Amino acid sequence: MRNVTFRQLRTVEAVCRLGKINLAAEALGLTGPALTLQIQHLERDAGIALFDRTRGGMVPTAYGLAFLEAARAIEDSLIALEDSIDAIKGLRTGRLRLGVVSTGKYFAPQLIAAFRDQVPAVEINLFIGNRAEIIAKLRDHEIDIALMGRPPRDFEVRAQVFGDHPLVFIAPAGHPLAGVLEISRERIAQEQFLVREKGSGTRISLEIFLSDTPHELEELGTEIASNETIKQAVIAGLGIAFISAHTIEQEVKLGRLVILDVIDTPIRRQWFTVSRLDRVATPAMQAFERFVLASGARYLPVVSKPYPANAFG
């Protein structure tokens, strides 16, 4: 296997990513027959099958996935090498592929802007998605750093805390539970909920919180994949929600939403910077992690009281 070239690995990566020989060939500037020949030679030399040929396209085998992992790791190393050379030259440049869970989009722009003020030459490509999507991109080497809660456990990562992440129950102004003190879990579970989709970190936290009550989330309410839509639905009186306090600062200050005083809330989770443990940290990654660990918490809204309209200090 030592004779495998990076060009061959890139061929495997393109076929894995695009699923079709013709699409991979077009992306690489090759003809379909030429790319097919490369794959066949590689399979013959290694004595393995890299792909299953199906009607739906090329599906990587376990061997193909191992080649894909190697290709992405080498690509990461080449990016790190390029950034390191720039750093040795004294150039404060580089690229950073940043993934942020959807809850983080309420503070990430301010944090990124502050970082760019300090290191303006670093190019940042931002991806926003739910927890499952961010983890998938981190696993597949498609992002360098993630800002998220609850780091993944199915592969090794470097996770560092940079701030608190409070989760709260919200209701529309005028709701019967607004202003009620020490609401029990059993009482809150009787309400109609607006919940995030499966795979969301907020939903996982809610499921854990209500695990001692005889209810399933599917029985409690409606699934909505957007924090913004959830907030508007709560304001309209369609139900209550469990949500990151960092997403509701303006609505609470304006009196459109209230934070309910449910016993054992706010639930205090944490925000992490997360990167693959086997990932070579580029100078751009190192600079961003240093900045977030030193200054990231100041961009997070602080919940000073559990309720009502003056909950944010």
Curated annotation (Swiss-Prot):
Pfam families: HTH_1, LysR_substrate. Residues 21-40 bind DNA. InterPro entries: LysR_subst-bd, Tscrpt_reg_HTH_LysR, WH-like_DNA-bd_sf, WH_DNA-bd_sf. Residues 1-61 form the HTH lysR-type domain. Gene3D superfamilies: Periplasmic binding protein-like II, Winged helix-like DNA-binding domain superfamily/Winged helix DNA-binding domain. It comes from the Bacteria. One of its GO terms (molecular function) is DNA-binding transcription factor activity. Keywords: Activator, DNA-binding, Plasmid, Transcription, Transcription regulation. Transcriptional activator for the cbb operon for RuBisCO and other Calvin cycle genes. Belongs to the LysR transcriptional regulatory family. This is HTH-type transcriptional regulator CbbR. It comes from Rhizobium meliloti (strain 1021) (Ensifer meliloti). The gene is cbbR.
